[in-house]
Regions:
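Glycine- and aromatic-enriched membrane insertion/assembly motifs of diderm outer-membrane
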Residues: 1-27
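Outer-membrane beta-barrel "beta-signal"
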Residues: 147-163
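Residues that define the transmembrane beta-barrel architecture of outer-membrane proteins
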Residues: 1-3, 33-39, 72-78, 110-114, ...
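Sequence/structural signature of outer-membrane beta-barrel proteins
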Residues: 10-12, 24-32, 46-48, 62-70, ...
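Membrane-embedded beta-strands of outer-membrane beta-barrel proteins
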Residues: 3-7, 41, 78-82, 116-118, ...
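Outer-membrane beta-barrel transmembrane domain signature
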Residues: 52-129
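Hydrophobic alpha-helical segments of small multi-pass membrane proteins
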Residues: 39-41, 61
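Short loop/turn motifs that connect adjacent beta-strands in outer-membrane beta-barrel proteins
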Residues: 10-17, 31, 48-56, 87-93, ...
Length: 163
């Protein structure tokens, strides 16, 4: 299970720059993650915007809280990444390379890691799409380098709520 929310906004004077906040919850026993809460916040730059997509880079402060509810222990990271999004007439694709450098010493193990994700998104109808995703994590100091393949159904649109 993977739930992710990202909010971003461009700077008015510098439209190639944006700020973002991301929250994610992940459960993947096959990859050794019983439950991970993830948060990051930072700045991004549109390095190469083009008609059907873009290449961006981001820097951020991030933290994880894994496998312990109602606790304030967390692992902090400096995060950087480069991302390529491309749209075609029939599908969209994403390729992401992220590096997390552990800056906290609360957790005894060094959890610095590289994460690579590729995704193909095929639109179905009315904002509904199918996504095929491959992810891998390579830890610097651990022998556990999990990877996973998943298929998901997504919906993109506005909620029509009124208050």
């Amino acid at each position: 299970m993977y739930i992710r929310y990202k909010n971003s906004s461009k700077f008015r004077r510098y439209s190639r720059l944006y700020r973002f906040t991301t929250f994610a919850y992940q459960k993947n026993k096959k990859a050794g993650v019983a439950l991970r809460y993830h948060f990051n916040q930072g700045l991004g730059v549109f390095v190469l915007p083009y008609k059907n997509g873009h290449v961006i880079t981001e820097i951020a402060h991030a933290y994880d809280m894994s496998d312990y509810l109602n606790d304030n222990r967390r692992t902090s990271y400096a995060r950087s990444g480069i991302y390529w999004d491309n749209d075609t007439q029939y599908f969209s694709s994403k390729l992401e390379f992220e590096y997390f450098y552990q800056i906290s010493e609360i957790v005894e193990q060094n959890l610095s890691r590289t994460q690579i994700m590729s995704e193909i998104i095929i639109p179905i109808k009315n904002g509904v799409s199918a996504s095929l995703i491959y992810e891998t994590e390579n830890y610097r100091k651990l022998n556990n380098n999990p990877n996973s393949i998943s298929l998901s159904i997504g919906w993109k649109g506005n909620l029509k709520w009124s208050f």
